[in-house]
Amino acid sequence: MKFFALFIYRPVATILLSVAITLCGILGFRMLPVAPLPQVDFPVIMVSASLPGASPETMASSVATPLERSLGRIAGVSEMTSSSSLGSTRIILQFDFDRDINGAARDVQAAINAAQSLLPSGMPSRPTYRKANPSDAPIMILTLTSDTYSQGELYDFASTQLAPTISQIDGVGDVDVGGSSLPAVRVGLTPQALFNQGVSLDDVRTAISNANVRKPQGALEDGTHRWQIQTNDELKTAAEYQPLIIHYNNGGAVRLGDVATVTDSVQDVRNAGMTNAKPAILLMIRKLPEANIIQTVDSIRAKLPELQETIPAAIDLQIAQDRSPTIRASLEEVEQTLIISVALVILVVFLFLRSGRATIIPAVAVPVSLIGTFAAMYLCGFSLNNLSLMALTIATGFVVDDAIVVLENIARHLEAGMKPLQAALQGTREVGFTVLSMSLSLVAVFLPLLLMGGLPGRLLREFAVTLSVAIGISLLVSLTLTPMMCGWMLKASKPREQKRLRGFGRMLVALQQGYGKSLKWVLNHTRLVGVVLLGTIALNISIPKTFFPEQDTGVLMGGIQADQSISFQAMRGKLQDFMKIIRDDPAVDNVTGFTGGSRVSSGMMFITLKPRDERSETAQQIIDRLRVKLAKEPGANLFLMAVQDIRVGGRQSNASYQYTLLSDDLAALREWEPKIRKKLATLPELADVNSDQQDNGAEMNLVYDRDTMARLGIDVQAANSLLNNAFGQRQISTIYQPMNQYKVVMEVDPRYTQDISALEKMFVINNEGKAIPLSYFAKWQPANAPLSVNHQGLSAASTISFNLPTGKSLSDASAAIDRAMTQLGVPSTVRGSFAGTAQVFQETMNSQVILIIAAIATVYIVLGILYESYVHPLTILSTLPSAGVGALLALELFNAPFSLIALIGIMLLIGIVKKNAIMMVDFALEAQRHGNLTPQEAIFQACLLRFRPIMMTTLAALFGALPLVLSGGDGSELRQPLEITIVGGLVMSQLLTLYTTPVVYLFFDRLRLRFSRKPKQTVTE
């Protein structure tokens, strides 16, 4: 009583307290960062190593395995995967959430150093690492195009000047430059000319290497001067290499130009990048795991004018893709929805109270509670994201509830003739415990969420804390500011209502009277209502499930898979064909893509869609339409998926979800993977089924006759060196320039390597100086070979990726895969498990029931403590089954799967619908204790007295959530499952709990009386 009086009779202090809360909230709002979702990125580090010309199996055994053994000992590694392809190995380390990325990076460098002695000596450089997840979609893609500069020169500008500068920007984790390679001098040898001159490929390599050296020459001094010695020991361009003497034949000089074509070109000619049908160099920028995407993009954009000045004017630097516009639009949509929700909630209050003066009070309480929450969000290190803003939108209906309960009770005393200050004090005292019970029990719902681990826990923590803080501030405001404003603003007389609102008032009175009559009948037929309640509890609704709603971020990512033996020239043609099909789609704004490098048979595409207001289809509908057109393209497949704000795991795949096969027996894995993949491809629950196992590449298998080699004076080292020199794009020398280092690349001229007959033209110089054709001591035949070798941990692995067809959920796909694996009878040597997002989905589904039970148990404990009763909390919790059924029916009606967002809605319903029961039970207990009423009379009176605030609070929550259900702008697919569950649950529970709660109350009261009828014991001294 004194607590309430302190604020009611000191209006200045109360107002200033509220102003202070509001000012702190405004300051916090201005400093809050903006993001699509809470920070939930796993710390990921990518280790890269190269050995040009080495086969995938060689890279896996000699490079990947030693590194994996060393890296696997690092603390906090939750997953380690690797992929080895031609001349390249990439190892992805995913760490626990609480692992500091910088500390992990130091451990990774130490592990690389420890494994260095076990790696091949021929590696051109030490393994390197990057603090970025390669499976994440780039946050921005920049393109360089020019009509005057070559692709190699553009790549040089991009990798030498732009990429290092961008990498230094706060938040940038990796800048991947694609579309070509660094400039180089390429030496294309003519086999017949070499044979005619008696020159071996090793002779050419040695001559070039010896002719281009960079060594210190020292200095000369006399008594007064010092001269630095400088020589022309370096060759920089193709024109300088052309006249180089590499051999003497019969006294005549054999120059490089006599046996080779020397050109200024690039290190790897098997690379191509394009943007909208034009050759381009791509800079794909990824953020650090802990970085804020909006701040990082803004920093990059601010740097672009400076970057443009560092490159020639003839080079066009453009932004081909930017993830931030749709994120900003989505957040703006939520902010607008929040404002609409506040307006609708205040309108509900006005319609019920029919007094402008009374409506001002909750109209002040709502913004104070919401704005004050921003201060706590800033102190907790949160951001303005879709989930935190959704929490505030939902909180609109909650924070007004407390003010409504207090205001309505005070208004009832005023209408009865009590003086304003006395009514404020008496009314607040009567409902203070009710408001406290509602708020604490609502906050209690979120305690299990705060204790939840893993990605779901991280994802939901900001939502739970934001909503809890808003409810806490609302509780404070409703017990301080609201009664003070009621005491000083409201009048003792019954307010005059406007004529146009009298109809609503009469309707409300009629509704209350009708409810009273129906409630009397219900209380006389409690068994029938009990059967209805039990039937609701027993109702089982089967609904599809998924991890996270499929978002439309306006960006698509596509992976190209062609025949594994395809040539680079053919693959480049496929890329161009696919890009044309996509570019012609009316919903597409921009297309970029690249292919080549160590994976000639694959490529990547990034597609930017037009803004939502310029297209009528969702991203998934566009994918479905394009899938039909792309299927007509022979010889290759393009798998499209919508880029999501959440992607789990470090695997790069061509689809959204992954199923990984592991085995310690590589042969068994290669035998069963095609069988499993083909089986999964037939399932209607899956789409775009593909695999990262590429073991059907074309290989030319050479078998040496060692006896013949020994007789001819040739060793294996010389033969292998021949093949590497001829076909390995061997980097044989380095050209040093002020800004970068470039390579001299030697190979047989591509004109002479169009078919396997090129091997017949190869020869080795033996120890007697004679040219011995390769065919003298080797036989060859075509065979299949792996284009990549994949590991997870230290086991051989193959990942099958898939998307979901329209109308199918992740739970459908998961169940179908489990059935298929059982039907196939896969041996125990091959183990299958979901990976990435699908794995988190499995873990989340297993914990959902426990989470809901924990929330209900927590609420029961809190209510039991508040009411000092085991029974009354059960009465209050009896409202939950109808709400849960209503939520699931609503999801079924809107064809929405049960996702993590829908789970939040269920948790919220646990907190929302029990408010009705709390108000009824609270007043019924008070009437029984002090009004000498029977339980039936008490609960009947409580239901009638609390009918208006129950309707007000329920409609406030309903209208607070309604704008999110009806919104269709950016990010709506993320928000709607939450609101659908809340609206469906509220409608169903409102229809039932007004009748079932009194029945349950009377049932437990009779039960209590039955067990309390015990003979009294006498105590004797």
Curated annotation (Swiss-Prot):
Keywords associated with the record: Cell inner membrane, Cell membrane, Membrane, Transmembrane, Transmembrane helix, Transport
Q: Which residues cross the membrane?
A: 7-29, 336-353, 360-379, 389-411, 431-453, 468-490, 849-871, 891-913, 944-966, 981-1003
The signal peptide stretch is none
Periplasmic-facing ranges = 30-335, 380-388, 454-467, 872-890, 967-980
Q: What molecular function does GO assign, one term?
A: xenobiotic transmembrane transporter activity
InterPro entries from the UniProt entry: AcrB_DN_DC_subdom, Acrflvin-R, Multidrug-R_MdtC
Annotated family: Belongs to the resistance-nodulation-cell division (RND) (TC 2.A.6) family. MdtC subfamily.
Describe its partners and assembly state.
Answer: Part of a tripartite efflux system composed of MdtA, MdtB and MdtC. MdtC forms a heteromultimer with MdtB.
- Descriptive protein name: Multidrug resistance protein MdtC
Query: Which organism does this record belong to?
Result: Shigella flexneri
